[in-house]
Design a protein with these regions (language model features):
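Phosphate-binding loop that captures ATP/GTP phosphates
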Residues: 41-95
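Cytosolic-facing regulatory segments adjacent to core modules
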Residues: 75, 79-85, 89, 94-146, ...
Protein backbone atom coordinates (compact mmCIF):
# COMPACT_ATOMS: atom_id res chain seq x y z
CA UNK A 1 0.00 0.00 0.00
CA UNK A 2 1.36 3.38 -1.04
CA UNK A 3 0.44 6.85 0.19
CA UNK A 4 1.19 9.76 -2.12
CA UNK A 5 0.69 13.43 -1.20
CA UNK A 6 0.22 16.06 -3.91
CA UNK A 7 1.57 19.40 -2.72
CA UNK A 8 2.35 22.77 -4.29
CA UNK A 9 3.16 26.11 -2.78
CA UNK A 10 0.75 28.57 -4.33
CA UNK A 11 -2.20 26.75 -5.90
CA UNK A 12 -3.50 27.42 -9.37
CA UNK A 13 -1.78 24.38 -10.86
CA UNK A 14 -4.89 22.22 -11.05
CA UNK A 15 -3.88 19.86 -8.25
CA UNK A 16 -7.45 18.73 -7.35
CA UNK A 17 -8.19 18.07 -11.03
CA UNK A 18 -4.97 16.11 -11.40
CA UNK A 19 -5.63 13.99 -8.29
CA UNK A 20 -9.26 13.38 -9.31
CA UNK A 21 -8.27 12.09 -12.75
CA UNK A 22 -5.44 9.95 -11.43
CA UNK A 23 -7.78 8.28 -8.94
CA UNK A 24 -10.23 7.38 -11.70
CA UNK A 25 -7.40 6.12 -13.89
CA UNK A 26 -6.05 3.90 -11.11
CA UNK A 27 -9.58 2.50 -10.71
CA UNK A 28 -9.76 1.92 -14.48
CA UNK A 29 -6.53 -0.05 -14.18
CA UNK A 30 -8.10 -2.36 -11.60
CA UNK A 31 -6.68 -0.86 -8.43
CA UNK A 32 -8.47 0.29 -5.27
CA UNK A 33 -7.54 3.96 -4.87
CA UNK A 34 -8.63 6.05 -1.90
CA UNK A 35 -8.86 9.84 -2.07
CA UNK A 36 -8.19 11.95 1.04
CA UNK A 37 -9.17 15.60 0.65
CA UNK A 38 -6.93 17.41 3.12
CA UNK A 39 -7.45 20.87 1.65
CA UNK A 40 -9.87 22.90 3.81
CA UNK A 41 -11.31 24.46 0.65
CA UNK A 42 -12.52 20.94 -0.29
CA UNK A 43 -12.31 21.58 -4.03
CA UNK A 44 -11.55 17.92 -4.73
CA UNK A 45 -14.63 16.83 -2.78
CA UNK A 46 -16.76 19.31 -4.72
CA UNK A 47 -15.56 17.67 -7.94
CA UNK A 48 -16.46 14.21 -6.66
CA UNK A 49 -19.95 14.64 -5.20
CA UNK A 50 -23.01 16.73 -5.95
CA UNK A 51 -23.72 19.95 -4.10
CA UNK A 52 -26.68 18.30 -2.36
CA UNK A 53 -24.52 15.42 -1.16
CA UNK A 54 -21.81 17.82 -0.02
CA UNK A 55 -24.32 19.75 2.07
CA UNK A 56 -25.43 16.54 3.79
CA UNK A 57 -21.84 15.53 4.47
CA UNK A 58 -21.05 18.87 6.10
CA UNK A 59 -24.24 19.52 8.02
CA UNK A 60 -25.79 16.16 8.92
CA UNK A 61 -24.40 15.01 12.26
CA UNK A 62 -25.09 11.31 11.72
CA UNK A 63 -23.23 11.28 8.39
CA UNK A 64 -19.86 11.95 9.94
CA UNK A 65 -17.54 10.63 7.26
CA UNK A 66 -15.55 13.80 6.45
CA UNK A 67 -11.88 14.08 7.35
CA UNK A 68 -12.80 16.61 10.05
CA UNK A 69 -14.89 13.99 11.88
CA UNK A 70 -12.11 11.41 11.54
CA UNK A 71 -9.60 13.75 13.15
CA UNK A 72 -11.95 14.90 15.89
CA UNK A 73 -12.50 11.33 17.01
CA UNK A 74 -8.80 10.47 16.99
CA UNK A 75 -7.48 13.27 19.14
CA UNK A 76 -6.16 12.11 22.54
CA UNK A 77 -8.89 14.17 24.23
CA UNK A 78 -11.70 12.35 22.39
CA UNK A 79 -13.74 9.71 24.22
CA UNK A 80 -15.50 8.36 21.11
CA UNK A 81 -13.27 7.02 18.31
CA UNK A 82 -14.75 7.61 14.85
CA UNK A 83 -16.61 4.95 12.96
CA UNK A 84 -14.82 4.34 9.69
CA UNK A 85 -16.99 5.43 6.76
CA UNK A 86 -15.93 5.85 3.15
CA UNK A 87 -17.79 7.71 0.43
CA UNK A 88 -17.87 5.25 -2.48
CA UNK A 89 -17.62 7.13 -5.78
CA UNK A 90 -17.63 4.02 -7.98
CA UNK A 91 -16.64 0.38 -7.47
CA UNK A 92 -13.09 0.36 -6.12
CA UNK A 93 -12.77 4.15 -5.70
CA UNK A 94 -13.38 5.70 -2.30
CA UNK A 95 -13.21 9.21 -0.85
CA UNK A 96 -12.73 10.65 2.61
CA UNK A 97 -14.41 14.01 1.93
CA UNK A 98 -12.92 17.32 2.89
CA UNK A 99 -14.54 19.80 5.24
CA UNK A 100 -14.15 23.55 5.60
CA UNK A 101 -13.90 23.01 9.35
CA UNK A 102 -10.56 21.27 8.84
CA UNK A 103 -9.03 24.76 9.01
CA UNK A 104 -9.70 24.74 12.77
CA UNK A 105 -6.91 22.17 13.19
CA UNK A 106 -4.27 24.55 11.82
CA UNK A 107 -3.60 26.37 15.09
CA UNK A 108 -3.65 23.18 17.18
CA UNK A 109 -1.16 21.40 14.91
CA UNK A 110 1.09 24.46 14.80
CA UNK A 111 1.14 24.68 18.60
CA UNK A 112 1.87 20.97 19.02
CA UNK A 113 4.85 21.21 16.65
CA UNK A 114 6.61 23.49 19.14
CA UNK A 115 6.04 20.92 21.92
CA UNK A 116 6.88 17.82 19.94
CA UNK A 117 8.97 16.20 22.71
CA UNK A 118 5.70 15.82 24.65
CA UNK A 119 4.02 12.41 23.98
CA UNK A 120 0.61 14.09 23.84
CA UNK A 121 1.91 16.49 21.18
CA UNK A 122 3.28 13.56 19.16
CA UNK A 123 -0.15 11.92 19.36
CA UNK A 124 -1.80 15.07 17.98
CA UNK A 125 0.77 15.54 15.21
CA UNK A 126 0.34 11.93 14.08
CA UNK A 127 -3.47 12.12 14.02
CA UNK A 128 -3.56 12.31 10.21
CA UNK A 129 -1.39 9.21 10.02
CA UNK A 130 -3.83 7.28 12.21
CA UNK A 131 -6.86 8.60 10.33
CA UNK A 132 -5.31 7.57 7.03
CA UNK A 133 -4.55 4.09 8.39
CA UNK A 134 -8.16 3.65 9.51
CA UNK A 135 -9.54 4.83 6.16
CA UNK A 136 -7.23 2.71 4.03
CA UNK A 137 -8.00 -0.41 6.08
CA UNK A 138 -11.73 0.20 5.79
CA UNK A 139 -11.53 0.65 2.02
CA UNK A 140 -8.84 -2.06 1.61
CA UNK A 141 -7.00 0.49 -0.51
CA UNK A 142 -3.82 -0.32 -2.38
CA UNK A 143 -2.99 3.33 -3.09
CA UNK A 144 -3.94 6.51 -1.22
CA UNK A 145 -3.91 9.88 -3.00
CA UNK A 146 -3.73 12.79 -0.55
CA UNK A 147 -4.86 16.16 -1.91
CA UNK A 148 -3.15 18.93 0.07
CA UNK A 149 -3.98 22.59 -0.03
CA UNK A 150 -1.34 25.04 -1.25
CA UNK A 151 1.17 26.48 1.17
CA UNK A 152 3.44 25.61 4.07
CA UNK A 153 0.90 25.36 6.89
CA UNK A 154 0.67 22.97 9.81
CA UNK A 155 -2.08 20.82 8.24
CA UNK A 156 0.10 20.16 5.23
CA UNK A 157 3.06 19.33 7.46
CA UNK A 158 1.02 16.75 9.40
CA UNK A 159 -0.30 15.31 6.14
CA UNK A 160 3.18 14.98 4.68
CA UNK A 161 4.31 13.11 7.79
CA UNK A 162 1.57 10.58 7.04
CA UNK A 163 2.60 10.13 3.39
CA UNK A 164 5.17 7.81 1.85
CA UNK A 165 5.93 10.05 -1.11
CA UNK A 166 5.38 13.62 -2.30
CA UNK A 167 4.52 14.69 -5.85
CA UNK A 168 4.74 18.36 -6.78
CA UNK A 169 2.36 19.64 -9.51
CA UNK A 170 3.89 22.53 -11.43
CA UNK A 171 3.29 24.91 -14.30
CA UNK A 172 5.99 26.40 -16.55
CA UNK A 173 6.12 29.75 -14.77
CA UNK A 174 8.11 31.80 -12.30
CA UNK A 175 5.81 30.95 -9.38
CA UNK A 176 6.47 27.22 -9.75
CA UNK A 177 10.24 27.60 -9.95
CA UNK A 178 10.33 29.95 -6.96
CA UNK A 179 7.95 27.64 -5.10
CA UNK A 180 10.30 24.69 -5.54
CA UNK A 181 12.92 26.54 -3.48
CA UNK A 182 10.43 27.04 -0.64
CA UNK A 183 9.00 23.52 -0.72
CA UNK A 184 12.34 21.77 -0.97
CA UNK A 185 13.90 23.63 1.94
CA UNK A 186 10.83 23.22 4.13
CA UNK A 187 10.52 19.51 3.35
CA UNK A 188 14.11 18.90 4.38
CA UNK A 189 13.71 20.86 7.62
CA UNK A 190 10.47 19.12 8.59
CA UNK A 191 11.95 15.69 7.89
CA UNK A 192 15.02 16.30 10.05
CA UNK A 193 13.01 17.84 12.89
CA UNK A 194 10.45 15.03 13.01
CA UNK A 195 12.92 12.16 12.77
CA UNK A 196 14.88 13.62 15.67
CA UNK A 197 11.72 13.50 17.81
CA UNK A 198 9.60 10.50 16.85
CA UNK A 199 9.59 7.18 14.98
CA UNK A 200 5.90 6.82 14.10
CA UNK A 201 4.97 7.77 11.52
CA UNK A 202 8.48 7.54 10.05
CA UNK A 203 8.12 10.92 8.33
CA UNK A 204 10.33 10.10 5.37
CA UNK A 205 8.76 12.83 3.19
CA UNK A 206 10.40 11.32 0.10
CA UNK A 207 9.98 13.24 -3.16
CA UNK A 208 8.61 11.02 -5.91
CA UNK A 209 8.91 13.63 -8.64
CA UNK A 210 7.01 16.45 -10.29
CA UNK A 211 4.29 16.82 -12.92
CA UNK A 212 4.14 19.77 -15.30
CA UNK A 213 0.81 20.83 -16.79
CA UNK A 214 1.57 22.81 -19.92
CA UNK A 215 -0.59 25.79 -20.91
CA UNK A 216 -3.22 25.57 -23.59
CA UNK A 217 -1.13 27.85 -25.82
CA UNK A 218 1.94 26.18 -27.34
CA UNK A 219 5.21 26.89 -25.53
CA UNK A 220 6.68 28.12 -28.81
CA UNK A 221 4.23 31.02 -28.58
CA UNK A 222 5.10 31.67 -24.92
CA UNK A 223 8.90 32.00 -24.72
CA UNK A 224 8.84 32.83 -21.02
CA UNK A 225 6.96 29.60 -20.29
CA UNK A 226 9.60 27.60 -22.17
CA UNK A 227 12.33 29.35 -20.19
CA UNK A 228 10.76 28.49 -16.83
CA UNK A 229 9.98 24.92 -17.85
CA UNK A 230 13.64 24.40 -18.70
CA UNK A 231 14.60 25.61 -15.20
CA UNK A 232 12.43 23.08 -13.38
CA UNK A 233 14.61 19.90 -13.58
CA UNK A 234 17.75 21.56 -12.20
CA UNK A 235 15.81 23.47 -9.56
CA UNK A 236 14.00 20.33 -8.40
CA UNK A 237 17.27 18.42 -8.04
CA UNK A 238 18.93 21.25 -6.14
CA UNK A 239 16.08 21.97 -3.72
CA UNK A 240 14.51 18.53 -3.17
CA UNK A 241 17.47 16.18 -3.70
CA UNK A 242 20.41 18.45 -2.80
CA UNK A 243 22.07 17.59 -6.13
CA UNK A 244 23.62 20.39 -8.16
CA UNK A 245 23.17 19.68 -11.87
CA UNK A 246 22.62 21.92 -14.87
CA UNK A 247 19.11 22.36 -16.23
CA UNK A 248 17.92 19.74 -18.69
CA UNK A 249 14.88 18.99 -20.79
CA UNK A 250 12.03 17.80 -18.52
CA UNK A 251 11.11 15.12 -21.07
CA UNK A 252 14.51 13.52 -20.41
CA UNK A 253 14.39 13.93 -16.63
CA UNK A 254 13.49 10.75 -14.67
CA UNK A 255 12.06 12.93 -11.89
CA UNK A 256 9.53 14.40 -14.32
CA UNK A 257 6.62 11.99 -14.01
CA UNK A 258 4.64 13.57 -16.81
CA UNK A 259 4.12 16.54 -19.10
CA UNK A 260 0.35 16.92 -19.13
CA UNK A 261 -1.81 18.86 -21.56
CA UNK A 262 -4.30 21.34 -20.13
CA UNK A 263 -7.35 20.44 -22.33
CA UNK A 264 -9.48 23.53 -21.50
CA UNK A 265 -12.40 22.41 -23.68
CA UNK A 266 -12.54 18.96 -22.11
CA UNK A 267 -12.36 20.41 -18.60
CA UNK A 268 -15.52 22.40 -19.22
CA UNK A 269 -17.39 19.38 -20.60
CA UNK A 270 -16.15 17.13 -17.79
CA UNK A 271 -17.26 19.60 -15.13
CA UNK A 272 -20.76 19.74 -16.61
CA UNK A 273 -20.96 15.95 -17.03
CA UNK A 274 -19.39 15.27 -13.59
CA UNK A 275 -17.04 12.68 -15.00
CA UNK A 276 -13.30 12.50 -15.83
CA UNK A 277 -12.22 14.03 -19.13
CA UNK A 278 -11.18 10.63 -20.48
CA UNK A 279 -14.67 9.21 -19.75
CA UNK A 280 -16.47 11.83 -21.84
CA UNK A 281 -18.81 10.55 -24.55
CA UNK A 282 -20.44 12.12 -27.60
CA UNK A 283 -23.58 12.61 -25.52
CA UNK A 284 -21.54 14.87 -23.22
CA UNK A 285 -20.53 17.04 -26.17
CA UNK A 286 -17.21 15.34 -26.97
CA UNK A 287 -17.51 15.09 -30.74
CA UNK A 288 -15.08 15.49 -33.61
CA UNK A 289 -11.77 16.97 -32.48
CA UNK A 290 -12.95 16.84 -28.86
CA UNK A 291 -13.28 13.06 -29.05
CA UNK A 292 -9.73 12.86 -30.37
CA UNK A 293 -8.66 14.92 -27.36
CA UNK A 294 -10.50 12.50 -25.05
CA UNK A 295 -8.48 9.58 -26.43
CA UNK A 296 -5.25 11.55 -26.10
CA UNK A 297 -6.16 12.55 -22.54
CA UNK A 298 -6.78 8.94 -21.62
CA UNK A 299 -3.41 7.92 -23.01
CA UNK A 300 -1.70 10.70 -21.04
CA UNK A 301 -3.26 9.73 -17.71
CA UNK A 302 -2.77 6.02 -18.29
CA UNK A 303 0.93 6.64 -18.90
CA UNK A 304 1.19 8.98 -15.91
CA UNK A 305 -0.48 6.51 -13.53
CA UNK A 306 1.83 3.70 -14.61
CA UNK A 307 4.89 5.94 -14.35
CA UNK A 308 3.96 6.92 -10.78
CA UNK A 309 3.61 3.29 -9.71
CA UNK A 310 6.87 2.32 -11.38
CA UNK A 311 8.71 5.20 -9.77
CA UNK A 312 7.29 4.39 -6.33
CA UNK A 313 8.35 0.76 -6.69
CA UNK A 314 11.88 1.84 -7.67
CA UNK A 315 12.23 4.18 -4.70
CA UNK A 316 10.80 1.58 -2.30
CA UNK A 317 13.74 -0.72 -3.06
CA UNK A 318 16.44 1.96 -3.19
Amino acid sequence: MTRIAFWDVSGGHGTPTLVYHLAHMFADQGRRPLLLDLDPSSRLTAMCVSEERLARLWWTDNDDRTIFRYLQGMLPSSSSPPEAKIEELRPGLGLVPGNLSLAFFEELLATMWTRAEDPDAIAVLSVLHRATSLAEQTHTADIVLMNLGPGLGAINRAALLAADYVITPLAPDLTSVAGLHLLGRRLSTWRATWQARATSPPGQLRPLGYIITTPAMALSRRPHAQHWQDQIPGTFRLTFLRISEPATDPSADPWCLGLMRYHPGLRTLAREARRPMFHLRPGDGAIGAQMTAVVRCREDFDRLARTILTRAAELATS
